[in-house]
Design a protein with these regions (language model features):
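Extracytoplasmic, non-cytosolic globular domains
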Residues: 205-207
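Cys-dependent protein tyrosine phosphatase-like superfamily
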Residues: 1-203
Length: 207
C-alpha cells in the first residue's frame, strides 16, 4: 500500500464466496509487506478469500483467471464495479470463457465443484458443429447464437501473423458495433436468463 499503513491483515478462506467464517485465519502478515503467498491443498476446488485489515476493513478477493484443462480464458467476473450503481458484482456468480465442448472428466468435476448450474453458449450453429458437444445432465446448457463473422479464419490469421495489429483493432471495433446493433433480441434473451436466480452460477462462453 502507498503510503505504508501500519497494522496487520488477516486472511480467511472458504469454497463459498458468500460464507467465509472468521474463526481461524489461514494467514497473517503486516500490511506494510504488501504481499503474501497462499498455497491451496486441493487445486480442483475454487477458493475465495476475505482480507481483514486491522480487524476493521474487509474485502473479498479471488483469482480472476482460473486454470481448467480444456477450457481457455476462464475468468471470474466478480469484483467489477457497476458504473451506474457503484456496487460490485459478486464473486463466483458469473464466469466467461472460450468454448466449452468435450472437456475431460476432471474439468467437468471442477465446474461442478464451483457450483456451475448454467452454461450459456453464444457460438453460431457452424461453430458448434465443428467441435464435439458437451453433454452433461448436471448442467443446463442454453444456446443463444450470436454470429461474429468467420472467427476461425481471423484467429488463424493472427497466429500466422497474416493479420496486422491495426487490422485486428478495426475488426474488433466493427464486431462490437455489429453486436450491439444486430443482436438486440439475442442479448435480451441472455439477460432474461441472467435475471433468473435459479440459473446461477453461470458460465457464458463463445468460440
Amino acid at each position: 500500500t502507498a503510503p505504508i499503513l501500519k497494522g496487520q491483515v488477516k486472511v480467511y478462506t472458504s469454497t463459498s464466496p458468500e460464507t467465509i467464517p472468521e474463526n481461524s485465519p489461514i494467514a497473517i502478515t503486516n500490511i506494510s509487506s504488501g504481499k503474501m503467498t497462499i498455497v491451496t491443498n486441493d487445486p480442483s476446488q475454487r477458493y475465495y478469500y476475505l482480507m481483514v485489515f486491522n480487524n476493521k476493513y474487509r474485502i473479498k478477493v479471488a483469482t480472476r483467471n482460473i486454470n481448467i484443462p480444456g477450457i481457455q480464458n476462464f475468468r471470474d467476473l466478480g469484483g467489477y464495479e457497476s458504473a451506474g450503481t457503484g456496487k460490485s458484482l459478486r464473486w463466483g456468480m458469473i464466469y466467461r470463457s472460450a468454448q466449452i465442448d468435450s472437456i475431460p472428466p476432471c474439468s467437468r468435476q471442477e465446474l461442478k465443484n464451483m457450483g456451475i448450474r448454467t452454461i450459456i453458449d453464444l457460438r453460431s450453429e457452424n461453430e458448434r458443429h465443428n467441435y464435439p458437444q458437451l453433454h452433461d445432465d448436471e448442467f443446463n446448457i442454453i444456446h443463444i447464437p450470436i454470429l461474429t463473422g468467420n472467427m476461425e479464419e481471423i484467429l488463424q490469421g493472427i497466429q500466422e501473423e497474416k493479420i496486422k495489429s491495426d487490422t485486428i483493432y478495426r475488426l474488433v471495433e466493427q464486431m462490437n458495433r455489429e453486436l450491439v446493433i444486430n443482436y438486440q433480441k439475442e442479448f435480451k434473451k441472455l439477460f432474461t436468463v441472467l435475471l433468473d436466480r435459479t440459473h446461477y452460477p453461470v458460465v457464458i462462453h463463445c468460440t
